[in-house]
């Protein structure tokens, strides 16, 4: 259960009022819990999001759930569905492609800049080790967390604060997308960590061209894999409907 603190009362215009905001940390924890449920498939694509059920499951009031769902809607993970309220937004091939194109451009610049300050990559090896350990354990969510931390460290090592800040809002979407990549099988997962290691070696060698090329290839392969899985799901659904 997530613990919820009672918001303090404040005065406005001489009158005591209950503050509207709940603890930001609680809202973020509710967000994280919902995203994790989406990533793990417990909240399926297109499934309804019922606030009372989520609040009851997490042991919080509806207020932080409402705020969390609003944030997730703004991030594109949740959407309004006519007559159904809020649902888990389906993954669309074009949206996946757009995200990977944006990420490819940003990370290509990040690794080029990081080649000038490889000493800033203090935790990269630790994230590689954690990712490989999670792979051995079959822990997809832990692999995703290590993947995000690894790529975030590359962005931070660039020394460009705008790069890291621009990428941060998109990580919840990529958690979901990465789950699709990692569910493709152990071979795909192992390849991801081998590619991470090669990118890191290129950055530490100061080889900006190779680091950029490897990064773009790494992301392009992941995008192609996810798009292929989504296209296959669409085709399967169409075939089922045709037979119905």
Which residues does each PLM region occupy?
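Conserved amphipathic alpha-helical segments that form helical-bundle/coiled-coil interaction surfaces
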Residues: 99, 119-180, 193-202, 210-221
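Alpha-helix N-cap/N′ positions at the starts of helices
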Residues: 83, 106, 126, 191-194
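Short linear motifs at protein or domain termini
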Residues: 1-119, 227-244
């Amino acid at each position: 259960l997530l613990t919820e603190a009672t918001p303090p009362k404040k005065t406005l215009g001489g009158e005591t009022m209950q503050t509207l905001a709940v603890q930001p940390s609680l809202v973020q924890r509710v967000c994280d819990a919902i995203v994790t449920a989406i990533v793990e498939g417990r909240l399926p694509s297109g499934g309804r999001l019922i606030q009372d059920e989520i609040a009851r499951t997490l042991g919080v009031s509806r207020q932080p759930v409402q705020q969390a769902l609003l944030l997730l809607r703004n991030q594109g993970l949740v959407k309004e569905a006519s007559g159904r309220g809020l649902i888990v937004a389906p993954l669309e091939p074009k949206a996946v492609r757009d995200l990977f194109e944006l990420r490819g451009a940003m990370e290509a610049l990040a690794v080029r800049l990081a080649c000038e300050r490889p000493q800033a990559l203090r935790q990269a090896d630790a994230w590689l080790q954690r990712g490989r350990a999670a792979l051995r354990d079959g822990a997809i969510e832990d692999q995703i967390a290590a993947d995000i931390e690894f790529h975030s460290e590359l962005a931070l090592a660039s020394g460009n604060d705008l790069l890291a800040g621009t990428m941060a809002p998109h990580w919840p979407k990529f958690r979901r997308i990465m789950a699709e990549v990692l569910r493709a099988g152990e071979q795909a997962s192992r390849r991801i960590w081998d590619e991470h290691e090669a990118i890191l070696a290129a950055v530490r060698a100061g080889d900006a061209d190779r680091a950029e090329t490897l990064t773009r290839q790494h992301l392009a392969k992941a995008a192609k894999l996810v798009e292929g899985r989504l296209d296959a799901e669409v085709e399967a659904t169409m075939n089922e409907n045709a037979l119905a």
